[in-house]
């Protein structure tokens, strides 16, 4: 699946294989997965399987048409200290809730780029919901990304963890922080945007591979 969804240039960088070999691998992968055209009915059937995870706020859920959709990317942005990280902490708890309470009974993968993850805040949130904080913490897979390369690599290697740990939510907080600090000045802007674009596509690929 990863081969089918990965651009040839990225496979070449990671493996050192030639273009013809890569083309054959991608073609074989696509054939095996039956990637191509399909009917709108099948697209609709797939869309019906999308679930919503509550944010814990009725007003915010209403803005998001019922909560955060699985199988896609949502960006929260705003000024410093406006509660973005707190929402991400809450989502790591809420994703574990039963469906009837707004969750999807899954685990969370948290990629922390700024060192702002606080287990004690998770514990406070679990107490408010009368949950076992030890179990909730066990169901949050945590990784600290120290630079943009490390961050990109963690996302690329997330597929196995997603399968093993029933991951239904991936948090990257913050997604562009490292890129902003490492690629400074107009001369680096194009490269920075290209890397961010590819990073987002890697995340979207995970959504497709693990719906």
Residue ranges of each PLM-predicted region?
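Small-residue hinge/turn detector
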Residues: 1-4, 18-19
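A conditional alpha-helix N-cap/helix-loop micro-motif detector
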Residues: 53-57, 85, 148-151, 189, ...
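Residue-level recognition of specific faces of alpha-helices
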Residues: 2, 73-75, 139
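Conserved inter-motif catalytic segment of the P-loop NTP-binding fold
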Residues: 103-189, 201-202
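The Walker A/P-loop phosphate-binding site
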Residues: 10, 14, 25-135
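Hydrophobic pocket-lining residues that define ligand/cofactor binding sites across diverse proteins
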Residues: 95, 99, 162, 207
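Substrate-engagement module of ASCE P-loop NTPases
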Residues: 191-211
